[in-house]
Design a protein with these regions (language model features):
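Helix-loop-helix junctions that connect adjacent transmembrane segments
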Residues: 14-21, 58, 136-140, 169-314
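Helix-loop-helix connectors at the membrane interface of multi-pass transporters/channels
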Residues: 90-94, 99, 121-143, 172, ...
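TM-loop-TM module centered on a large, flexible mid-protein loop between adjacent transmembrane helices
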Residues: 90-91, 97, 129-133, 253-326, ...
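Membrane-helix boundary/coupling elements in multi-pass transport proteins
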Residues: 84, 107-124, 230, 235-243, ...
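Membrane-interface loop-to-helix entry segments
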Residues: 142-200, 231, 253-260, 401-404, ...
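A generic transmembrane alpha-helix motif of multi-pass inner-membrane proteins
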Residues: 392, 396-405, 428-519
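Membrane-interface "cap" regions at the ends of multi-pass membrane proteins
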Residues: 1-46, 51-56, 69, 73, ...
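Extracellular loop-to-transmembrane helix junctions
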Residues: 41-141, 266, 466-479, 486
């Protein structure tokens, strides 16, 4: 189909299009997997999962891997037919209509911006503590947050391929240091030898396994922490316009990131439990959350590999957090770019640099992230606040919004294929798998809302109390804007979620026409 015209002013470098054909499969994988931040995910989410599931935390990662793989089945079918930087926003618009589509688009854009700020706070905390530990230079976390945001803005201006290479180098370092730790543990059998009990999903709900802080077990916390570790895997379609073969790469990158991360997470979480022992794994987590140790992973690395590996891990958690923040930054910029290109948000957001990167949207993200971080720094200027407030509270908002939109995407996939008149409707890929995906995402949302007080460590904080309502209000604002445009600006309303690449990247795949999904 021909791309719908964008309602935007242009400069000599503005095309309303991103640079096409510049990303291969490795580059897209780097952009996706760094969003999941494997090192940060393991150092933070494995202990959280252990709080709820005890030594069965590896089983929680197995359950999440299976659930997200099933969700990906229908998601990939949709991505093969809809190629746009809008990702979830475009999918919901095509499947459920423009009104819920814009609600999803605004919500997911807000969530990714919040994630960028949250992970920037995590990076600031670890940069400050690591620098103080290694050099004696004691600066507040916000100094490193400013440096990180400036660097992200600079990288965003350059070609996306350059950014992908930076992300790739940092990602490889994260994976290697965790694998070195795991090999060191497995080589000697850990503290008590090997056991299959941590890999049995039944034990997630077994009170005898949950010997952590909650005593009687909180399976919801264990499962939520596992799902949390994959946030970012869904980014592949957002880079579709910039890939050489969007239909093939979206499928391979999504499956590769979900299954690859799943196997990796299970290995590392199992190494953690094996290294400490079934009982010791929970005891170490208690020490971490009591503030006695910076991470339950550091003593393990010291014991089974050596202090040099621990120092390397401390450095890589800083660079890995930066890479994660940059990945979310890039994706949030692409959502704002897509919304600006279609005339929903100010058209200036669709302006690109001479390298065809979403320059205006990126600078907008920079400004929003800066203001959001500033609010938290004013609330709690301490270095610990960067982690315990900004870096812990904000991801709960981001994860809840993303899980809610993923649930909507599952329903959108089903309706899209049921109403499109296509012969490629399949009982498994476009019906049963999305239904299972919807159920999994809905359950994860309920678990987050029910356990948000324990997960944040600040059940009485206003931010935590109103968190579900913030997600709902943002979604409703997006829907209200779409409803307003439907009556006052039909031409702009018609563009919601309908932009697509002018030419299909795969000559054998017919590009989907605008179906005029109604809402």
């Amino acid at each position: 189909m021909t791309a719908l015209p964008a309602n935007t002013s242009t400069t000599e470098h503005t095309s309303g299009h991103l640079a096409g054909g510049v990303l291969g499969l490795p580059s897209v994988l780097f952009c996706i997997v760094t969003g999941a931040a494997p090192l940060a995910a393991m150092l933070f989410n494995v202990p959280v999962a252990t709080l709820g599931g005890g030594y069965a935390s590896p089983a929680a990662f197995i359950v999440a891997t299976v659930a997200l793989t099933i969700f990906s089945v229908g998601y990939i079918e949709m991505a093969r037919r809809v190629t746009s930087a809008g990702g979830f926003y475009t999918f919901v618009s095509r499947g459920l209509g423009r009104v819920p589509g814009l609600g999803s688009g605004l919500l997911i854009a807000v969530c990714y911006v919040v994630f960028s700020a949250a992970v920037l706070g995590v990076m600031g905390y670890f940069a400050a503590t690591t620098m103080a530990s290694l050099t004696g230079i004691d600066l507040p976390a916000w100094v490193y947050m400013v440096i990180g945001l400036v660097l992200m803005s600079m990288f965003a201006y350059f070609h996306i391929e350059f950014t992908a290479k930076v992300l790739g180098v940092l990602l490889i370092g994260e994976v290697l240091v965790l694998l070195i730790m795991a090999i060191g543990i497995f080589a000697v059998g850990g503290a008590e030898g090997f056991s299959l009990a941590p890999l049995n999903p039944v034990n997630i709900f077994n009170n005898d396994a949950a010997i952590g802080v909650f005593g009687t077990g909180a399976a919801g916390i264990a499962l939520f922490a596992a799902f949390w570790s994959w946030v970012g895997f869904e980014m592949a379609p957002n880079y579709a316009e910039e890939t050489r073969d969007p239909h093939k790469i979206a499928k391979t990158a999504t499956y590769g990131s979900v299954i690859g991360l799943g196997v990796f997470y299970v290995i590392i979480s199992y190494a953690y439990v094996t290294g400490w022992g079934l009982t010791g794994s929970a005891t170490a987590v208690q020490s971490q959350f009591a503030g006695d140790i910076a991470s339950a992973f550091y003593p393990l690395t010291d014991r089974y590999v050596g202090s040099w590996a621990t120092v390397l891990m401390e450095i890589l958690i800083v660079t890995g957090s930066f890479a994660c923040a940059m990945s979310f930054y890039n994706t949030s910029a692409r959502y704002l770019f897509a919304l600006g290109r279609e005339g929903v948000l100010p058209g200036a957001l669709a302006r690109t640099s001479k390298r065809q990167s979403p320059a205006a949207a990126s600078m907008t993200v920079t400004a929003i992230v800066a203001l959001y971080c500033l609010a938290f720094v004013i609330y709690d200027p301490s270095t610990e606040g960067a982690l315990l407030k900004l870096g812990t509270w904000s991801p709960l908002l981001g994860v809840l919004g993303i899980l809610a939109v993923q649930a909507l995407v599952s329903i959108a996939i089903i309706r899209y294929f049921l109403t499109s008149g296509k012969s490629d409707f399949h009982w498994w890929t476009t019906l049963v798998a999305p239904l299972i995906g919807f159920a999994a995402m809905a359950v994860a949302c309920v678990l987050l809302v029910a356990n948000r007080g324990d997960l944040s460590g600040a059940a009485d904080a206003v931010y935590i109390e109103i968190l579900p309502w913030v997600v709902l209000v943002v979604f409703l604002i997006g829907m209200a804007v779409a409803a307003y445009l439907r009556s006052s600006a039909p031409d702009r309303y018609a563009r919601i979620g309908q932009f697509e690449m002018t030419e299909p990247a795969d000559p054998g795949q017919q590009t989907e026409k605008t179906t005029g999904a109604q809402a």
